Curated annotation (Swiss-Prot):
This is La protein homolog. Residues 37-129 form the HTH La-type RNA-binding domain. Residues 141-228 form the RRM domain. Disulfide bonds: none annotated. One of its GO terms (cellular component) is ribonucleoprotein complex. It comes from the Eukaryota. Residues 1-43, 343-383 are annotated as: Disordered. Pfam families: La, RRM_3. The lineage of its organism: Eukaryota, Metazoa, Ecdysozoa, Arthropoda, Hexapoda. PANTHER family: LUPUS LA PROTEIN HOMOLOG (PTHR22792:SF166), LUPUS LA PROTEIN-RELATED (PTHR22792).
Amino acid sequence: MTEVEAKATATEETTKEEEEAPETTAEQTEESAQETSENVSKLEASTIRQLEYYFGDANLARDKFLQEQISKDEGWVPVDVLLTFKRLKSLSEDKKVIVDAIEKSDEGLIEVSEDREKLRRHPERPLPEQNEETRKEIYGRTVYVKGFAPEEGTQMSELLEFFEPFEKITNIVMRKYHDKATKKYLFKGSVFVTFATKDHCAEFLKKEKLGYKGKELIRKMQDDYFEEKKAERRKKDKKKEEDRFNIDHLPKGASVHLSGFNKDTSRETIKETILKLDESLEVAFIDYAKTDTEGTVRFAADDAGKKFMEKLTDSKIQIDEEEITARLLEGDEEKEFLRKVVKDQQARRQASNARNKGRTPEGRQASRPPQEWRRKAKGGRGE
């Protein structure tokens, strides 16, 4: 049996809690659990698979409880302790059955102590270093598969049986979510399947059609699945951002970009020049700072920018003895500018609120006349 691959989506649950963990995993042998020699029973094959899952790469890397047990006695873990794990206990509570089974494994991952009371991961099979390189390597041979009828209560045993014909699957992860109504982790209907090699992974994806209980399965590389999810999140975030900075209330066709200012031009000069051109044009705001060479004028009414442009010759206007080039903002450029306007407005509002909140009650009271003075001023009983 191959070692369990380090799961990219590993949880912090201990082995004792694995029945409630957000994900359920299972290891299979390279030849699959069913392709054992004739002298290994189905029970023994299941026992071997479960024990090698406990001591395998994926589980051992995240299982704090088992790590603690391993640290106590040169890696040895009493079989009695392992039998407190529900899944192993459900297979057999007989220590002899457990030990006899693991001794029949061809994988060589687990050692049995001389007194047959303890098990440990073989010292010559150290746990691989858990780093970014390892994670990427595993992602490169892991497939996302969806369509396993969660409403029918699909079990890991059914998934193991389904994937049995495919070559050298080393790990299966049942993806789960927390259901608030039942307060339980329920199967999503999708799994991550890790193959021993990239070639086996590619062969699995090349199969034309693959179904489960009459439903075609969706298959893609885990990396591709994650990238698609990232793209979906970015799209949702962008929509949230657009909703947050809604520009519907701002006038359209009212923003004009001006370029060519000298360093001494002020906003007041720009506004005065525009009003001299047409005093009916109401300027809402000028996005410009002195010494800038360009800026944007936002008018207060719809299409006021268009009206302003119609009064220019060749899109030019003279400001501070400089020939300034004007350009009406339209389409995406206008939307982007108006979103910036809303962001700036919100930032100024938040800064103002923060300043107001920063005032102490004592400070606010000190700015007002004492209560006795107010009474006297109103003709009240001050004495």
